[in-house]
Amino acid sequence: GAAIAPAGGLAQAPALPRAGPGPAAAPTLSTQSLAALTARANAGTVGVISGGIDGTYVRIAADLSAVLDDGEALRVLAILGKGSLQNLADIMLLRGVDIGIVQSDALAFARRQRLLPGLETQIQYIAKLYDEEVHILARPGIGSLSELAGQAVNVDVRGSGTAMTAGLLFETLGIAIRPEHDVQDTALTRLGAGEIAAQVFVAGKPARLFAGVPPGSGLRFLPVPATPALLETYLPSRLAAADYPALVPEGAAVETIAVGAVMAVYAWAPGTERHRKVARFVEALNTNFGRFLVPPRHPKWREVNLAAQVPGWTRFDAAAGPPQRQRRSREDRQDPS
């Protein structure tokens, strides 16, 4: 602890050990105190990787921190991320990242592409969150997806869920676009300047990215047909004037498709400290869920059913016993826990 100054004077710093041969000096009290503080600070900390600053993921992660972080027993760190596929990699590989928000189709896609070894055993889910709508905003003069053939279309950064879904969407519909990979706010500026034909953004409506588009811009959302092939993976949805009053006429709606968002988690081995941390997070989420359903929390929380199943995913069991077949633990990442 800190030294106490005698009356009329300043506290003297403790003498430093002299350099020289011999065994290392024993840790000082201050070093031990710092180690204890470090352990205490990390004991209840859970990292949640989200998305870009203009998307819904980051707002959901911020809500998780605002509601569940009590500053003592549980701290929730909301982290900006780069999209679903990168989030899966970050959950598996980055120290301090336990949980991430990803699209429900990301796990199957990453598995098919063999992007990460052992993915199916090391990634589980806590809850299905809500459905995210596919937004395809086009410049004036373009009225259908087929008109995007051969055109420059921004599909977000590589590794993002939007890039993945856009690739699957246009491939399924047989439309060959010229994909661009700018971040979304840059793409919106380029779209307004006529440098690209359209931009694709997968996000829960209403997405903040489009809030600043002024009425009369000429930009418009393109309808996405709910073909049988697309409905094998996605859900039908729509964008209404209530969601985007500057982009959708009053009383009208634009047909589109949606994909589920999932709260993914690393499959920590039961009995480890990291498993206990996530279990505390899950308990707090269940206990405080009602607080997410009222303002100022994001309206998408009202679509969440914590008991909903996610096909193709394994649910994280907060009360799990030791698994019968142990996978290699991620404790070698040396998380400070």
Residues covered by each model-derived region:
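Immediate post-signal peptide segment of exported/extracytoplasmic ligand-binding proteins
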Residues: L10-V48, G141-A152
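Pocket-flanking alpha-helical
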Residues: S65-A66, L77-G118, A187-R190, I196, ...
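Pocket-lining segment of extracytoplasmic ligand-binding domains
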Residues: Q12, S104-D105, R114, I175-T272
